[in-house]
Structures are given as C-alpha cells and as structure tokens.
Swiss-Prot record:
Name this protein carries in UniProt: Expansin-B1
Residue ranges constituting the Expansin-like EG45 domain according to the UniProt record: 61-167
Superkingdom of source: Eukaryota
Tissue: Expressed in mature anthers but not in vegetative or other floral tissues.
Keywords: Allergen, Cell wall, Cell wall biogenesis/degradation, Disulfide bond, Glycoprotein, Membrane, Secreted, Signal
Keyword set includes Secreted: yes
Length: 267
C-alpha cells in the first residue's frame, strides 16, 4: 500500500496538472495570409473589444498607428489580427470578409473589416479581435447585442480587395517627432491590397529614390545627415507588387504632425 505521503504527493501533482490544463489550449498561429484572393473561406475564432458599438480602441487608434478609425473610410469596421494576419505591421490596412453561422444570432452574411490593430492571444490559428461594431455586423437584424454576449465564436473569413470611395486617396501623416533629418511617415487608406511592403521618397530635382525603414505598424522612417527639403514624391509598394507614385505629395515647408492627402490611389 502506498504511504500517506506518497498519496499526498500524487494528489498535489494531480492538482497541479489540473490547474495547468484549466485554461484554453495554446494554438500555434497559421501560415501568413497573403494576397491570394479567392472564394475559399478559412476558419477563425472571433472576439470583440472596446465599446459595444465602438471602433475598438478607446483612443480610436491601434497598433497600426492609424488615427480616427471610427471615421471614414474605416467607419469603425476594424479588427485586431493575430500574427499571420497582422504580420508585424505588414498586414495593416488589409481587408477581409468575415461571417458566422452559429450561434443563432449569426446572419451568415459577411461583414467587411479592416486590420488596424494586433492581438497575440493564442486561441486559434487565426483570430480576429473585432471592434464591437464589426462583431455586431455579423448578426441578424436586431440581434447584434445578443451576438456580442456570445463572447468567443467560430467564424469563416477570406481576404478581399480594399475598395474606397472615389475621393479617398492614399494619405500620409508626418509623425510628431519628425524634423528635417528624421522623417516618420504613416501611410494609410491604400485601396487594393491595402497593406504596404515598401515606401520610398524622392526629393524635387533628384533621380534617387530613398527607401524608408519600417518603424512600427504602418509607420515608416528615414534618418538622413542631409536635411530633407520638400516638395518630395512618395512611392508606395503594396504586398501584391503594385507601385503607386504620389508626385510632390509632401510640400515644401512640410510640418510634423501634419496630414497630406495625395491625388493617387491603388487599383
């Protein structure tokens, strides 16, 4: 017969194992979602955060660096993405359709969302942490509040092209810390692929395109010993390889914490 101390040890070990296994299992992330558009739907978990009918973050920002994600063209239809969706910032601005068929409040009709933030909860290979507004958009009419009460749900998603109104153009926000020797540029409202893999600038009268480095989210930066002088053009490359040139997008006398709207857009 086992001694009482051995029995006690077994009980303690069993309790420890039980405690460890009580939480949800950690699921490794899936392969990165790329620009392979098609009709195939993939499985994902969806949650929501922020105000029930809000845009997500309390400050209407997020890990991509966008501001005012409650306003056009995002209009609060936003989501955090886990690693294979957010892609360390390279997924910022990409667009997805997402839908659910269960629980009963689900409409099974897709809602269009934009990636504006990140999450790292390992609850599924693909995980969308949606704004309250976007989560509710998957519901049947009048059932959005009921759906939000479900918490975590199973969904299906697919990547789609981003489409914006004709007057929405690629826009640049020069970040607050920028100065003539350091430029930090937030790139937003890119149609088509939505996400950006390269940003370059060219000063007026020069033939040289200077590559910016990724800073964080959708923000790109360049340090230069020679002061940058406007106007300069910006060349943006999307994940699918489309190159868009915004001629003289940043004017002479540009200022930090300023927004400059180009006159170009991706396809």
């Amino acid at each position: 017969m086992a001694s009482s101390s051995l029995l006690l040890a077994c009980v303690v070990v069993a309790a420890m194992v039980s405690a460890v296994s009580c939480g949800p299992p950690k699921v490794p992330p899936g392969p990165n979602i790329t620009t392979s558009y098609g009709d195939k739907w993939l499985e994902a978990k969806a949650t929501w955060y922020g105000a029930p009918k809000g845009a997500g973050p309390k400050d209407n920002g997020g890990a991509c660096g966008y501001k005012d994600v409650d306003k056009a063209p995002f209009l609060g239809m936003n989501s955090c993405g886990n690693d294979p969706i957010f892609k360390d910032g390279k997924g910022c601005g990409s667009c997805f359709e997402i839908k659910c068929s269960k629980p009963e409040a689900c409409s099974d009709k897709p809602a269009l969302i934009h990636v504006t933030d990140m999450n790292d909860e390992p609850i599924a290979a693909y995980h969308f942490d949606l704004s309250g507004l976007a989560f509710g958009a998957m519901a049947k009419d009048g059932k959005d509040e009921e759906l939000r009460k479900a918490g975590i749900i199973d969904t299906q998603f697919r990547r789609v092209k981003c489409k914006y109104p004709a007057d929405t153009k690629i826009t640049f926000h020069i970040e607050k810390a920028s100065n003539p020797n350091y430029l930090a540029l937030l790139v937003k409202y890119v149609a088509g692929d939505g996400d950006v893999v390269e940003v370059e600038i060219k000063e007026k009268g020069s033939e040289e395109w200077k590559a910016l480095k990724e800073s964080w989210g959708a923000i790109w930066r360049i340090d230069t010993p020679k002061p940058l002088k406007g106007p300069f053009s910006v060349r943006v490359t999307t994940e699918g390889g489309e190159k868009i040139i915004a001629e003289d997008a940043i004017p002479d006398g540009w200022k930090a914490d300023s927004v400059y709207k180009s006159n170009v857009q991706a396809k």
